[in-house]
């Protein structure tokens, strides 16, 4: 009788997998949840199903590459102007992901990767274009600042850290990361410090260019999972950079002088010819850009060779900046109007006020990037006072307010006036 009772107690204490029904003695591991149990075999089966689904979804994404027209239509919703740069980028990105979609289908011709160089004045939309592109294609995207990079073994960020950031953006999914986009900003700051090779090692300029060559062309990068410096006891993640699209961008201050002065014959004395200064704006001069100009600026020929597609961006004029303020889906005016809506107040700008804001941004030579700081300065006092005021229905900003000659116009609701009349 006692033997039967013992066996009964054992069966009561035995735990079973809620999915396959196997007992804890039949499997290696049983994981407990709040009210359920799952065995290691069911976990492995689930992982296999998820892997297969990820592969199939990846194939679908590869087959559904957006056309250049579709890409440029979405870019137009967010980025004002820069039509030439948009065309170059949309065609380049379409061809890149089309190449990835069909590389496994045909083995006769191997299509090479074409990385992109964006050249344009500060605040003209280089970084924003790259961010919007990654959002359209729905691939992992990361940004890196070239000024923080140093050659391996020196204080600063290793080049491999760029791939680590991309891996983190892909939630450590190596397959997704290997199809991502990397944007390297301020690439003009890693130019060679002098035309002549120096005895001392240039670890943050030419050294970084040399370090970027292999990952931009395609190599197996060993990435430490936690980031930072490598050490022998650490396990590495292997990431193939062959199919990662690299977009480099920079303002290249002073490059316009190199382009304008190309082919000039210098002479001195009474017979010297004085050439009139180039009165074109920076964006127009950049259209005549040649690889030799970039070499003279300080980029090494091997680095330029890894960036076969060059897209130049134009200066933003007053009309373009006014459109940037009001037209895109996430325009600055719309952002501040939403902030004021949270206080149940309508915010309105006169057209001439927006033009004055645009002119101020051009005077500061900060492009579209300077618009936010100007808007903050104009609306600071209003945003400070508004939460404490009652009955304000609308705030109107005129050109005099932007110039500092007047205060914003507050329009109060009729309810407060009615209350005053009743009390009287």
From Swiss-Prot:
Q: Which SUPFAM superfamilies match?
A: Glucocorticoid receptor-like (DNA-binding domain), P-loop containing nucleoside triphosphate hydrolases
GO cellular component, alphabetical, reads: HslUV protease complex
Tell me the GO molecular function terms.
ATP binding; ATP hydrolysis activity; ATP-dependent protein folding chaperone; protein dimerization activity; unfolded protein binding; zinc ion binding
- Residues reported to bind Zn(2+): 17, 20, 39, 42
Organism's domain of life?
Bacteria
Annotated keywords: ATP-binding, Chaperone, Metal-binding, Nucleotide-binding, Zinc
Domain ClpX-type ZB residues, every copy: 5-58
Question: Which Gene3D superfamilies does the record associate with it?
Answer: 1.10.8.60, ClpX chaperone, C4-type zinc finger domain, P-loop containing nucleotide triphosphate hydrolases
Q: Name one Pfam family in it.
A: AAA_2
Give the family per the record. Belongs to the ClpX chaperone family.
How does this chain assemble?
Component of the ClpX-ClpP complex. Forms a hexameric ring that, in the presence of ATP, binds to fourteen ClpP subunits assembled into a disk-like structure with a central cavity, resembling the structure of eukaryotic proteasomes.
Query: In UniProt terms, what function does this protein have?
Result: ATP-dependent specificity component of the Clp protease. It directs the protease to specific substrates. Can perform chaperone functions in the absence of ClpP.
Protein name as annotated: ATP-dependent Clp protease ATP-binding subunit ClpX
Q: Which organism is it from?
A: Bartonella henselae (strain ATCC 49882 / DSM 28221 / CCUG 30454 / Houston 1) (Rochalimaea henselae)
């Amino acid at each position: 009788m006692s033997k039967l009772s013992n066996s009964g107690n054992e069966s009561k204490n035995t735990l079973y997998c809620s999915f396959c029904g196997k007992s804890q003695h039949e499997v290696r591991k049983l994981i407990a949840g709040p009210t359920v149990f799952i065995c290691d075999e069911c976990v492995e089966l689930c992982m296999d199903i998820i892997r297969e689904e990820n592969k199939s979804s990846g194939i679908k994404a590869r087959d559904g590459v957006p056309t250049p027209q579709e890409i440029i239509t979405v870019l137009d919703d967010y980025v004002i102007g820069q039509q030439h740069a948009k065309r170059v980028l949309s065609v380049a990105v379409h061809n890149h992901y089309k190449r990835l979609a069909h590389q496994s289908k045909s083995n006769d011709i191997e299509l090479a990767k074409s990385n992109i160089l964006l050249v344009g004045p500060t605040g003209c939309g280089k970084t924003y274009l790259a961010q919007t592109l990654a959002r359209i294609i729905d691939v992992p995207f990361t940004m890196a600042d070239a000024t923080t990079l140093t050659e391996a073994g020196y204080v600063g960020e290793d080049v491999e850290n760029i791939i680590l950031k991309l891996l983190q953006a892909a939630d450590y999914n190596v397959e997704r990361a290997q199809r991502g986009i990397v944007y390297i900003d301020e690439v003009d700051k890693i130019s060679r410090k002098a035309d002549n090779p120096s005895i001392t090692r240039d670890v943050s300029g030419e050294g970084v260019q040399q370090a970027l060559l292999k990952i931009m062309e395609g190599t197996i990068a060993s990435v430490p999972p936690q980031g930072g410096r490598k050490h022998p006891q650490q396990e590495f993640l292997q990431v193939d950079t062959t199919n990662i699209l690299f977009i480099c961008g920079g303002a290249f201050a002073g490059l316009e002088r190199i382009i304008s002065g190309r082919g000039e014959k210098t002479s001195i004395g009474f017979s010297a010819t004085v050439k009139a200064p180039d009165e074109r704006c920076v964006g127009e001069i950049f259209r005549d850009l040649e690889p030799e100009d970039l070499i003279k600026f300080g980029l090494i020929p091997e680095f330029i060779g890894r960036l076969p597609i060059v897209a130049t961006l134009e200066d933003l004029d007053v009309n373009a900046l006014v459109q940037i303020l009001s037209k895109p889906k996430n325009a600055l005016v719309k952002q501040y109007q939403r902030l004021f809506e949270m206080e149940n107040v309508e915010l309105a700008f006169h057209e001439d006020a927006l033009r004055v804001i645009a002119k101020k941004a051009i005077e500061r030579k900060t492009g579209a990037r300077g618009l936010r700081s100007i808007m903050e300065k104009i609306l600071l006092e209003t945003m400070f006072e508004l939460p404490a005021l009652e009955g304000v229905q609308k705030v109107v900003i005129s050109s005099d307010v932007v110039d500092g000659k007047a205060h914003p116009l507050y329009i109060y609701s009729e309810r407060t006036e009615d209350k005053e009349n009743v009390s009287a």
